[in-house]
């Protein structure tokens, strides 16, 4: 009887414990260490400046006191995030397996022909990285394994392989590797006849080489070790030490970077120096690698141009003579003075000439019209031109790999919010299309289950902003459905509507997914970019909030169900919009966000700073300082309510240093007036692009989606 009493007592205690509410995890409280920053007689106090570590501190075998304090804080934030989202772990795993399950594990790319070989890559089941192959002469030939990135990645927490390039004699493979995610690549070389690695190794590069015609000489871009600026072009002879490499060009202007490539004709090597507003090209015959590069057109402030060559002619895409949306010129190779340039495609106010590719008998232009990509084909022999037809209202098309000049076939890709990425060959003579591959989406996916459309939101100044959105059919426009609104809006980069199989996990749970094509991109032409940069940058942020208000007013969602997402410069967007109108959003995901704008742009030692003064402004000038300060998310944190916020970053990020989001979260937590979630997730092994494996990166997506789905009650 006594024993029964004890058992009953234990059961009652256990029951009481199970009914006790789980104690809410304690959020980290970052220590304040005020640092006074004074510019233009204006004082700022940064309480979290101490979170900034140097590369030397991060790479040290034994952490010093400051490093340990930073690591402890980041790990505490990671633990807090895990605790706050532990109830979503099952959902996260479900989402991960769901997204992974849509990906065909054994898959390969469509082969393309280059210099007598067909090249393609393949993924194998269970493998995170691709394998690269080629076949000689015909697709029926025996395949030759060039590189297995999975083997290179063995034992590495992070692995990026880039810039695969084959010598003109088809015997040597060059490629770049980065095992830290700082984008300092080491170039290696492989003898394809023996499969053996050559002893040549070139460190601190962009990871790509351009071959001279002799297959023994190559050129590459070297980086500044501290700022990572691509600042010099070097010449390397196979079989020699990299210390003996010859510098053929050094870019003295710290606001410029440089790179090297080759024309379509393969006759010329081309060095490009560029910044946001100005470019300059230098050329040298590829069969004379020891020669001196000569300037094509001397740089002029705000003159942007690029060149290519075929059939003894240079083609020049240029914005000279107020061609804001660019025009295409042509000139003989033996006399390319600007006086000899002739118009091939004139400038148009409503069409942005984005680029072009050359064939012996054709020129294919990429044109952006009314926020959509268009492909235009010119017959160089007859002068006739036509556009490739596309059926959907909202789509994205891009010129793909076209290495063979003597061809009637154009390779391009096509995708939309409902159509997976598709690869086509287009016969430019007969105008017939051949679908070579549509990316297979496993499971029960059918594009017929989804609806995409284009809307136009009106900004506060009357500008019409395009919005692309997609939802599962059966969606009711009653204002009750959750929505994810995404945007970028910087650098003139256009966020085109493309298929993302991961988004299906939101759509199938009742979400609508929308993209706001805000100013700062180039969706509506080059002026669209100009109107969202420098002293017009505020337009980017107000455009996004105006799009959010429009979608709410049109009953696509409501503020308690609206989520926003952006990364990098899009993370800056997220920080700015929640400072301006936090009441519009239930939750925000800011990935690797650039949020400490003024402090970063005042420091030329930080990677990308000098190169980006033409994007944001140079805060050493007082006008820009105060304007940038007016929107910098870190500087504009207020004592107000904020939505639920999830912030992600990478400890080794070279583009947006980890301390920016870390400081931002610490300041938000100290000042915000609400009890909403504020979470920081730092990948301690990755950089700006996150995890390097094709499946592992889905875990971050699963975390972000679980965060939103949980808040949406899904």
Language-model features and meaning:
Residues 133-136, 188-191, 232-240, 283-286, ...:
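Beta-propeller blade signature
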Residues 515-714:
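Active-site-proximal cap/loop segments of hydrolase catalytic domains
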Residues 150-164, 175-182, 196-198, 224, ...:
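Cap/lid segment of the alpha/beta-hydrolase catalytic domain
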Residues 118, 173-174, 218, 269, ...:
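Hydrophobic beta-strand positions that form the internal "hydrophobic ladder"
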Residues 191-203, 240-252, 287-297, 336-346, ...:
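Blade-edge beta-strand/turn elements of extracellular beta-propeller
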Residues 123-130, 153-158, 177-186, 201-204, ...:
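A flexible loop/linker signature enriched in serine peptidases of the S9 family
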Residues 15-18:
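C-terminal motif of bacterial Sec signal peptides marking the signal peptidase cleavage site
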Residues 68-165, 176, 256-309, 343, ...:
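Non-catalytic accessory segments flanking enzyme active sites
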């Amino acid at each position: 009887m006594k024993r029964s009493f004890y058992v009953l007592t234990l059961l009652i205690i256990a029951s009481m414990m199970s009914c006790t509410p789980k104690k809410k995890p304690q959020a980290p409280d970052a220590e304040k260490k005020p640092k006074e920053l004074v510019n233009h007689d204006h004082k700022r106090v940064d309480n979290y400046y101490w979170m900034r570590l140097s590369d030397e501190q991060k790479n040290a075998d034994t952490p010093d006191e400051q490093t340990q304090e930073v690591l402890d804080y980041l790990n505490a934030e990671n633990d807090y995030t895990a605790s706050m989202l532990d109830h979503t772990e099952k959902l996260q795993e479900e989402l991960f397996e769901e997204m992974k399950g849509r990906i065909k594990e054994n898959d390969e790319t469509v082969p393309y022909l280059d210099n007598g070989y067909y090249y393609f890559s393949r993924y194998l089941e269970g493998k995170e990285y691709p394998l690269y192959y080629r076949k000689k002469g015909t697709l029926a030939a025996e395949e030759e394994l060039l590189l297995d990135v999975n083997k290179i990645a063995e034992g590495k927490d992070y692995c990026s392989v880039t810039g695969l390039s084959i010598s003109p004699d088809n015997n040597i493979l060059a490629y770049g590797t980065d095992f830290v995610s700082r984008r300092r690549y080491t170039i290696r070389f492989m003898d394809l006849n023996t499969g053996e690695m050559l002893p040549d190794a070139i460190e601190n590069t962009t990871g790509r080489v351009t071959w001279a015609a002799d297959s023994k000489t190559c050129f590459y871009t070297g980086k500044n070790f501290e700022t990572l600026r691509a600042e010099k072009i070097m010449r390397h002879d196979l079989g020699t030490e990299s210390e003996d490499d010859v510098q053929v060009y050094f870019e003295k202007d710290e606001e410029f970077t440089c790179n090297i490539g080759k024309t379509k004709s393969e006759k010329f090597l081309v060095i490009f120096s560029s910044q946001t507003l100005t470019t300059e090209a230098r050329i040298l015959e590829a069969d004379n690698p020891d020669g001196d590069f000569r300037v094509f057109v001397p740089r002029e402030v705000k003159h942007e141009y690029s060149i290519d060559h075929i059939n003894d002619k240079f083609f020049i895409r240029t914005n000279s003579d107020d061609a804001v949306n660019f025009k295409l010129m042509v000139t003989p190779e033996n006399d390319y003075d600007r006086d000899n340039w002739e118009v091939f495609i004139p400038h148009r106010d409503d069409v942005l000439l984005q680029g072009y590719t050359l064939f012996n008998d054709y020129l294919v232009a990429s044109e952006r019209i009314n926020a959509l990509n268009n492909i235009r084909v010119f017959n160089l022999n007859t002068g006739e031109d036509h556009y490739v037809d596309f059926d959907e209202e909202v789509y994205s098309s891009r010129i793909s790999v076209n290495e063979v000049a003597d061809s009637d076939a154009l390779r391009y890709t096509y995708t939309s919010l409902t159509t997976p990425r598709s690869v086509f060959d287009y016969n430019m003579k007969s105008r017939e299309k051949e679908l070579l591959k549509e990316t297979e989406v496993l499971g029960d996916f059918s594009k017929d289950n989804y609806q995409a459309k284009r809307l136009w939101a009106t900004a506060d100044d009357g500008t019409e902003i395009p919005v692309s959105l997609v939802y599962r059919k059966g969606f009711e426009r009653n204002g009750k459905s959750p929505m994810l609104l995404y945007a970028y809006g910087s650098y003139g980069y256009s966020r085109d509507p493309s298929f993302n199989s991961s988004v299906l996990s939101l759509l199938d749970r009742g979400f609508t997914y929308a993209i706001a094509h805000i100013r700062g991109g180039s969706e509506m032409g080059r002026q669209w970019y100009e109107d969202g940069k420098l002293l017009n940058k505020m337009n980017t942020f107000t455009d996004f909030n105006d799009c959010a208000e429009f979608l709410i007013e049109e009953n696509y969602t409501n503020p308690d169900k609206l989520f926003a997402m952006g990364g990098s410069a899009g993370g800056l967007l997220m920080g700015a919009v929640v400072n301006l109108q936090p009441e519009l959003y239930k939750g925000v995901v800011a990935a690797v966000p650039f949020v400490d704008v003024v402090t970063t742009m005042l420091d030329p030692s930080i990677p990308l700073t000098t190169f980006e003064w033409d994007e944001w402004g140079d805060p050493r000038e007082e006008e820009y300082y105060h304007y940038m300060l007016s929107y910098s998310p870190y500087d504009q944190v207020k004592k107000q309510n904020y939505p639920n916020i999830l912030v992600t970053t990478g400890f080794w990020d070279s583009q947006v240093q980890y301390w920016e989001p870390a400081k931002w979260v610490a300041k938000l937590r100290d000042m915000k007036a609400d009890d909403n979630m504020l979470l920081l997730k730092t990948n301690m092994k990755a950089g700006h692009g996150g995890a390097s494996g094709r499946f592992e990166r889905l875990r971050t997506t699963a975390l972000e989606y679980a965060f939103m789905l949980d808040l949406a009650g899904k």
